[in-house]
Structure formats: structure tokens, C-alpha cells
């Protein structure tokens, strides 16, 4: 079979999976970025539309059937445990450092702030709004691909096309709680990290308290609603 790589060494399959994840995610986010940059579409809309397309394609390709787990040697190769603690946190720290550096120490990062805050003013100052917007989506695609690769390494048991559904809302909630503004141009990496810790702690607390999993979505929705409302109020006051 054309997609049968069982004869390929494990290391080769791991590297191939990483390349495929990053390439596919970058291609799809680039498409969303193009529509956002070219037609001034709201990034939330283009991203959600993209997500539906991807989910449909994956469901069609797998026929909605669950697939088996990966070899036990692969998780130990990518995210081995040290004294019982998973080293996936080291990958997360590496991603934080890299994104922080891009955001704060490069011209592209400074242009991101400018375009997010006021695209018209950024264009007048000579910044290519199209290139910066597309670049932001490409960078997101690379991170998505890398994250999906790590998540596959964590997978225990069978998986399905629906795996990970709803996580995008958790990511949005964590960012909003961390001070990222929906109006653009406001936010720091440190704030996102704090937001992730707060939202994760809240989720685990609800689980420990025995709150029904379905009701946890209600709490997540309320958090997003309140955080965005406060963000909008700050924006209106600034105006």
C-alpha cells in the first residue's frame, strides 16, 4: 500500500510524521492566512472554516473509523519520562522561548504588533500587511504541526478524526485570560503562559471537584465571554 511505512525504520517514520504534520498544517494555515490578508476576512472566521474543511477531509479519509495506537517505542523516543515525569514540558518550554524571541527580538515580531494594533498605520509606514499576516499564519501552522506530532506521540489506545475537537476553545480561552486582545496589537507571551496555567488549573480543579465534564464546557464558555467582554470594554474606553 502506498501509505504503508511499516518497513521504514522507526526513526525514519518519526521524522516523516513530523515533516508531514508541519507541511500539511502550514499549507492549510497559509490558505486561511491568504483569505484573511487578501480579503480582510476576520482571522477567527477563516480559521474556523479551515478547521471544518480539515475535519471533513480527515473524516472522509478515515471513513470515521478509529485507528490503532502507535508503537510503544515511539513515545519513549520523543517524550521519555524522567523519574516518572514526562519531558513534553521541555518541548513546550522550547516553543515558548522561540516564539518569545521572534515576538520581541525580530523585525517580524515588531511588525506583528504594528499590524495587529493598526494595519492602516502599519501600511503607511511601509510594512507589508499582507506578508506579515500571512507570515503569522505560517508560523502558527508550523507550531500546530509540531504540536500535533507531539500529541500523536502521547496517544494511548485508538484515535479518531474527532480527536482534539474542542481544544481550540481551550486555547482561545487561555489566550484571552492571558491578556491577548481580540482587537489585536495587545498581548505578551508571558501573559499567554499565565493564561494557560490558570485555565489548566481551573479545568483540573473542576475535575477534582467532580463537576460533570459537559458542565466544564459551560464554565469555559463563561470564561471566554467574560474575558472578551472585559477586553471590549477596555477597547471602547480607549476609543
What does each model-found stretch correspond to?
Residues 22-25, 51-59, 91-102, 137-148, ...:
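Hydrophobic core segments of alpha-helical transmembrane domains in multi-pass membrane transport
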Residues 3-51, 194-195:
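Alpha-helical transmembrane segments within multi-pass membrane transporters and channels
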Residues 13-20, 27-32, 83-159:
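Helix-loop-helix "hairpin" substructures at the membrane interface of multi-pass membrane proteins
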Residues 144, 155, 159-218:
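Transmembrane alpha-helical segments in multi-pass inner-membrane proteins
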Residues 27-39, 60-61, 101, 105, ...:
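Membrane-interface helix caps of multi-pass small-molecule transporters
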Residues 15-23, 45-48, 89-94, 134-138, ...:
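Hydrophobic alpha-helical transmembrane segments
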Residues 124-131, 154, 202-239:
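Cytosolic-side transmembrane-helix boundaries in multi-pass membrane proteins
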Residues 8, 15, 39, 43-106, ...:
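Transmembrane helix-bundle core of multi-pass membrane transporters
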Amino acid at each position: 500500500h502506498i501509505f504503508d511505512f511499516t518497513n521504514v525504520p522507526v526513526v525514519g517514520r518519526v521524522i516523516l510524521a513530523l515533516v508531514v504534520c508541519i507541511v500539511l498544517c502550514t499549507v492549510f494555515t497559509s490558505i486561511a492566512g491568504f483569505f484573511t490578508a487578501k480579503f480582510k476576512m476576520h482571522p477567527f472566521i477563516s480559521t474556523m472554516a479551515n478547521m471544518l474543511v480539515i475535519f471533513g477531509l480527515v473524516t472522509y479519509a478515515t471513513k470515521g473509523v478509529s485507528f490503532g495506537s502507535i508503537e510503544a517505542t515511539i513515545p519513549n523516543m520523543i517524550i521519555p519520562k524522567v523519574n516518572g515525569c514526562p519531558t513534553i514540558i521541555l518541548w513546550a518550554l522550547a516553543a515558548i522561548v522561540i516564539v518569545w524571541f521572534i515576538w520581541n527580538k525580530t523585525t517580524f515580531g515588531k511588525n506583528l504588533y504594528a499590524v495587529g494594533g493598526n494595519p492602516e498605520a502599519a501600511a503607511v509606514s511601509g510594512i507589508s500587511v499582507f506578508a506579515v499576516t500571512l507570515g503569522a499564519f505560517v508560523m502558527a501552522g508550523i507550531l500546530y504541526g509540531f504540536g500535533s506530532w507531539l500529541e500523536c506521540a502521547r496517544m494511548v489506545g485508538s484515535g479518531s478524526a474527532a480527536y482534539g475537537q474542542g481544544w481550540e476553545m481551550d486555547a482561545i480561552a487561555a489566550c484571552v485570560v492571558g491578556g491577548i486582545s481580540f482587537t489585536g496589537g495587545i498581548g505578551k507571551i508571558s501573559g499567554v503562559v499565565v493564561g494557560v496555567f490558570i485555565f489548566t488549573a481551573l479545568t483540573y480543579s473542576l475535575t477534582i471537584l467532580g463537576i460533570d465534564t459537559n458542565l466544564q464546557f459551560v464554565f469555559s464558555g463563561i470564561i471566554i465571554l467574560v474575558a472578551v467582554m472585559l477586553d471590549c470594554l477596555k477597547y471602547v474606553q480607549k476609543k
